[in-house]
Design a protein with these regions (language model features):
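Conserved N-proximal alpha/beta basic substrate-recognition cap immediately N-terminal to
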Residues: 5-8, 15-121
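Short, solvent-exposed loop/turn elements at beta->coil junctions and helix N-caps
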Residues: 44-46, 189-194, 266-269
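A short beta-strand motif that forms the metal-chelation/ATP-contact edge
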Residues: 53-58, 201-205, 275-287
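Phosphate-binding site of ATP-dependent enzymes
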Residues: 165-256, 277
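ATP-dependent carboxylate activation and anion-phosphoryl transfer catalytic cores
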Residues: 241-310
Length: 310
């Protein structure tokens, strides 16, 4: 704590993200309004004294996926010096999308997925996935689909993710083979095309309490170029959720094996029959769309202050 007894908070970002993260200004202002000493350090800045903070809150560390080993080593070190939110064990679990299998095993409805490991025969794996028979998916069941998605298990902001038509197997195979050849765990998923009309629903929680929800426009278009920047531009608008979406989002939060996170974002889309299914659970560095909900920055600031004093 500072000499006045107020906490010192780090909102952790990355150099390229500092000017792009639209959540940072309102959150910084909400904390400062409570007398909190706020800094915006970059996670890989070796000059930062992490022990001088009462809590370090991961915000826009959006370059972590290309430096995952370095990032997790930093998180381990940081957690030894101060409170890290979300905690390092949560971050380690959440940065690998195989957590989706655990959610599915806990009874949470999740987009059907096939995981593919480096060393596997890319052509055979893709053929099995598209055949749709027994064993075609690691978990879940998919009715007939026309498009599908190839993406890395460790990735952020749709980077290296692409949508393909079933008839475009050559391009999809090249993408899958490239990811596997570079040693990256990869995932194949049916593209649930209701998202084109309905979009995604992002449900945001602070300290286990529902804060707000938004609609995210569909990101992956057939034949689009891979995302090259830190994140893909998104069309965001407020959205009220129904009981079905709320139920799935809460069930997802309860399935996290490491206790209640400071912040969480559950991304939902409509399945084949319109019921909500989990696309992703974001516990590391999600955009929280604070500008879309009055009072959300103040709610998160209050949760941060409370955690800093635990």
């Amino acid at each position: 704590m500072t000499s006045g007894g107020t906490p010192r908070v780090a909102l952790v970002t990355a150099r390229e993200a500092l000017a792009l993260d639209e959540d940072l200004p309102p959150l910084r202002d909400a904390l400062a309004a409570q007398g909190v000493d706020v800094d915006l350090p970059c996670w890989d800045d070796a000059s930062v004294d992490w022990a001088s903070f009462d809590i370090a809150v991961l915000r826009s560390t959006w370059d972590y996926a290309e430096r995952i080993g370095e990032f997790l080593e930093w998180a381990d070190r940081c957690a030894c010096l101060t409170r890290l939110a979300n905690p390092v064990e949560t971050v380690r679990w959440n940065t690998d999308k195989r957590y989706l299998l655990e959610l599915s095993q806990a009874g949470v409805p999740v987009v059907p997925t096939r995981f593919v490991s480096p060393g596997a025969d890319a052509s055979m794996e893709l053929m099995r996935f598209l055949d749709g028979g027994a064993g075609s998916l690691t978990f879940g069941h998919a009715d007939g689909f026309t498009d599908f998605v190839v993406k890395p298990v460790i990735g952020a902001a749709s980077r290296d993710a692409a949508r393909y038509a079933r008839v475009d197997g050559t391009a999809a195979l090249a993408h899958l083979a490239r990811l596997l050849e570079t040693g990256r765990q990869t995932m194949l998923q049916p593209y649930l095309d209701r998202v084109d009309a309905h979009g995604e629903t992002a449900v945001i929680f602070f300290d286990g309490a529902l804060s707000h929800s938004v609609r995210k426009g569909p990101l992956l278009k057939r034949g689009a170029r891979l995302v090259s920047g830190l994140f893909a531009p998104e069309r965001i608008t407020p959205r009220e959720i129904g009981e079905a979406e709320r139920g799935v989002a809460v069930a997802t939060l309860r399935a996290i094996p490491f206790g209640v996170p400071l912040y969480a974002r559950v991304d939902l889309i409509q399945g084949d029959h319109g019921a909500p299914v989990v696309l992703e659970l974001e516990l590391t560095e999600p955009s929280l769309f604070l500008a879309q909900a009055a009072g959300s920055a103040e709610r998160l600031a209050a949760a941060i202050i409370a955690r800093s004093r635990d």
